């Protein structure tokens, strides 16, 4: 069975826990609280797990999704993709063989600017 790992920064803590509650088999790599943390630490931790467990996948969550993707992609054998729609997520796997998806919390529109 393929392993799925998940991690976030403090901004993604609640979404991470929501995802965990919906999946039967997933390994939570932290953080364990919503206290402020450095996202690169969690991107590195998850990337190492995915790289060392052949066929596994990862989910990283932060405010923009970009920081986690950049940090994860610095690791060997990692292909992290920022996913913001069902189609984008599917294509990242089919065409780019992504083994980590990064999710964003913050979006922007004209009303927010």
Region roles according to the model:
Residues 35-51:
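Glycine-rich oxoanion-binding loops at beta->alpha junctions
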């Amino acid at each position: 069975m393929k392993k799925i790992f998940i991690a976030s920064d403090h901004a993604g803590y609640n979404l991470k826990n929501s995802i965990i509650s919906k999946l039967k088999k997933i390994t939570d790599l932290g953080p364990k609280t919503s206290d402020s943390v450095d996202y690169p630490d969690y991107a590195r931790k998850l990337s190492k797990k995915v790289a060392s467990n052949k066929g596994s996948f990862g989910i990283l969550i932060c405010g923009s999704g970009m920081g986690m993707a950049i940090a994860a992609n610095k690791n060997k054998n990692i292909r992290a993709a920022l996913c913001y729609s069902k189609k984008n997520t599917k294509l990242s796997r089919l065409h780019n063989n992504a083994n980590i998806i990064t999710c964003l919390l913050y979006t922007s529109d004209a009303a927010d600017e």
